[in-house]
Regions:
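Q-loop/switch helix immediately C-terminal to the Walker
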Residues: 112, 119-133, 147
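Conserved Walker
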Residues: 67-68
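The feature captures the beta-strand-to-loop junction immediately N-terminal to the Walker
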Residues: 59-61
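Helix-to-loop junction immediately C-terminal to a conserved catalytic motif
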Residues: 74
Length: 165
């Protein structure tokens, strides 16, 4: 079995969402492509919980399974193993009608990498805007710095190296 040595991270901004209803979740979500000795494990037993109102980013290297996971979440690909739940119930997209009903309750916004960031903005400005938009305006500078550092480390980046701080 061929397995890529890549990392897929699900980053979610978790201010004030713990008590919100669970929207989408998964246990052991896995996807294989190919047959026999030429099997590629595209997504390897991913667990996740997304709550209503939560902003979620799927971040990873090229080939880490971001697009495959997104397609499974949207119901465009079936998972090889594991389960996906929508609003607390096992998702059923076995018919066209059921898939259409599911699509009425879920939506993805795909990022255009060329228009996502203003090249004149520094990364700390972008991260600070995210914190403030998600209810963190009242937090201390130290707490915001800690959150920005944690967000960067979650995707294997060093905040200090990105910002020269």
């Amino acid at each position: 079995m061929k397995t890529e040595n890549t990392t897929l991270n699900l980053a979610a901004h978790r201010l004030d969402v713990k008590n919100r209803p669970l929207c989408l979740s998964g246990k052991g979500v896995t996807k294989y492509f190919g047959i026999g000795s030429k099997v590629t494990k595209a997504v390897d037993h991913v667990d996740f919980e997304f709550h209503e109102g939560e902003l979620v980013s799927i971040v990873g290297e090229s080939g880490s399974g971001k697009t495959t996971l997104s397609k499974m979440l949207l119901g465009l690909l079936n998972e090889t193993d594991g389960e996906i739940f929508f609003q607390g119930k096992k998702r059923d997209i076995s018919t066209r009608a059921k898939k259409k009903e599911y699509w009425q309750g879920i939506q993805a916004i795909f990022q255009d990498p060329f228009s996502s960031f203003n090249t004149f903005n520094k990364i700390d400005t972008v991260l600070l805007d995210c914190i403030n938009m998600r209810g963190g305006k009242h937090l201390s500078k130290e707490k915001k710095f800690e959150m920005m550092t944690e967000a960067c480390s979650f995707v294997n980046l060093k905040f200090a190296e990105l910002t020269n701080k």
